[in-house]
């Protein structure tokens, strides 16, 4: 049998069925996971192309393999498009993920046991910002700043106090669960005061930055990292940006040969396609709608009596504090999942429960906004979520409410067909 000519169904019916069933799931659930989105057919086509066959260690025109003329063109397009999108001088599009983008910065700018100062995990920071289980917490001396105990906003006074006290080599401004804007200018002043590098991790808000809906870190941060999915709506991957081309040289060497080998050229091509989509006028409207939808969802849940962390949102993230309701994040997320609404359990600031249980849930609006949802739809979603949470407050067995909401979800999703 010539396996090169077999389609997926002929070659592997098990994987074919898994993909088919996942497609059905994605078409029929309300996707509220803040880090997820739906890519275009064009991005899928590039990602599934024969560019996956090509090995291309190195950088355009400086490869360790021959036959890279076409993939060089793809990478150059991705670089030029992302530089235009963020108005910056340097870009590296080779990181396989946001985590590897962050690791590359650490490898380029730090030495083992150097001090880094980042947001604590329970305040909304990311594992790669110095959390103990992560390599960043094992290789470096990590210090964490927190949000204010009353407002749940970043405590810039504490950031400055800790920076002066611990003299970090790197200050990290970024998050994975923080619903408000970040003042990168303030972070840069603090970094300069102690002679630290400033890294901005904009994995969640990259789309907002690119469209002017959030302050850009490019003029302030020495280096900026991001994922290429989430609000950028591209394939899963990472990128690194800077206006300092000398730092860019260090980044290039740290990524290859320091951290990675061959880049994934099919993913880089898909990134280029997504970046072209991001440069279209429609993308600005999309991001505005993402933010408006998040605000509508937050208000809808507040009107049903639920506590929204910080009292609202400035981006795509809505965090619900369930402590007063006596519901764990795990229980809420599982019940919502059974009702056709996917989100994730999430720690809230100063959470005393296990990270596998949590006292909150996190919602995000990018995915459903891609499908065409507007504010009125998110108001309805808010009521669906509240119905599930109300049921959990009064019954251990929430199955009847889950089935009722699941029926409503199915009706709603029929109005928003996506992947044919």
From Swiss-Prot:
GO molecular-function terms, A-Z: glycine hydroxymethyltransferase activity; pyridoxal phosphate binding
Keywords: Amino-acid biosynthesis, Cytoplasm, One-carbon metabolism, Pyridoxal phosphate, Transferase
Involved pathway(s): One-carbon metabolism; tetrahydrofolate interconversion; Amino-acid biosynthesis; glycine biosynthesis; glycine from L-serine: step 1/1
Alphabetical list of InterPro entries matching this protein: PyrdxlP-dep_Trfase, PyrdxlP-dep_Trfase_major, PyrdxlP-dep_Trfase_small, Ser_HO-MeTrfase, Ser_HO-MeTrfase-like, Ser_HO-MeTrfase_PLP_BS, SHMT-like_dom
Enzyme kind, highest EC tier: transferase
Compartments (UniProt record): Cytoplasm
The family this protein is said to belong to: Belongs to the SHMT family.
Record-given protein name: Serine hydroxymethyltransferase
Gene that produces this protein: glyA
């Amino acid at each position: 049998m010539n396996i090169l000519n077999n389609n997926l169904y002929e070659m592997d019916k098990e994987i074919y069925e898994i993909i088919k069933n996942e497609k059905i799931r994605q078409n029929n659930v309300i996707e509220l996971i803040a880090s997820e989105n739906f890519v275009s057919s064009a991005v899928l086509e590039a990602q599934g192309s024969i560019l996956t066959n090509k090995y291309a260690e190195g950088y355009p025109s400086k490869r360790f393999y021959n036959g890279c003329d076409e993939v060089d063109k793809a990478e150059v397009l991705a670089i030029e498009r992302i530089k235009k999108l963020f108005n910056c001088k340097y870009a590296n599009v080779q990181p396989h993920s946001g985590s590897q983008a962050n690791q590359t910065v650490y490898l380029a700018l730090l030495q083992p046991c150097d001090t880094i100062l980042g947001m604590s995990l329970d305040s909304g920071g990311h594992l790669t910002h110095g959390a103990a289980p992560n390599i960043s917490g094992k290789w470096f001396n990590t210090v964490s700043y927190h949000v204010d105990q009353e407002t749940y906003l970043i405590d810039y006074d504490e950031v400055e106090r800790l920076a002066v006290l611990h003299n970090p080599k790197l200050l990290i401004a970024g998050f994975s669960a923080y619903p408000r804007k970040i003042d990168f200018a303030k972070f840069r002043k603090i970094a300069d005061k102690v002679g630290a590098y400033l890294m901005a991790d904009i994995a969640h808000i990259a789309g907002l930055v690119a469209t002017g809906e959030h302050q850009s870190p490019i003029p302030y941060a020495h280096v900026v990292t991001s994922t290429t999915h989430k609000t950028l709506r591209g394939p899963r991957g990472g990128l690194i940006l800077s206006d300092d081309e000398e730092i860019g040289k260090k980044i290039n060497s740290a990524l290859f040969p320091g951290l990675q080998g061959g880049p994934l050229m099919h993913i880089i091509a898909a990134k280029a396609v997504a970046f072209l989509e991001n440069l279209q006028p429609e993308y600005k409207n999309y991001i505005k709608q993402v933010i408006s939808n998040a605000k509508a969802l937050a208000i809808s849940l507040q009107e049903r009596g639920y506590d929204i962390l910080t009292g609202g949102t400035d981006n795509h993230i809505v965090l619900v504090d369930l402590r007063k309701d006596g519901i764990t994040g795990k229980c809420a997320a599982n019940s919502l999942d059974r009702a056709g609404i996917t989100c994730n359990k999430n720690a809230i600031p100063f959470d005393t429960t296990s990270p596998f249980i949590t006292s909150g849930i996190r919602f995000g609006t990018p995915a459903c906004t891609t499908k065409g949802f507007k504010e009125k739809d998110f108001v309805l979603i808010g009521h669906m979520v509240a119905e599930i949470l109300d049921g959990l407050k009064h019954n251990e067995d929430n199955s009847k409410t889950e089935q009722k909401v699941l029926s409503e979800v199915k009706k709603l999703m029929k109005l928003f067909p996506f992947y044919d």
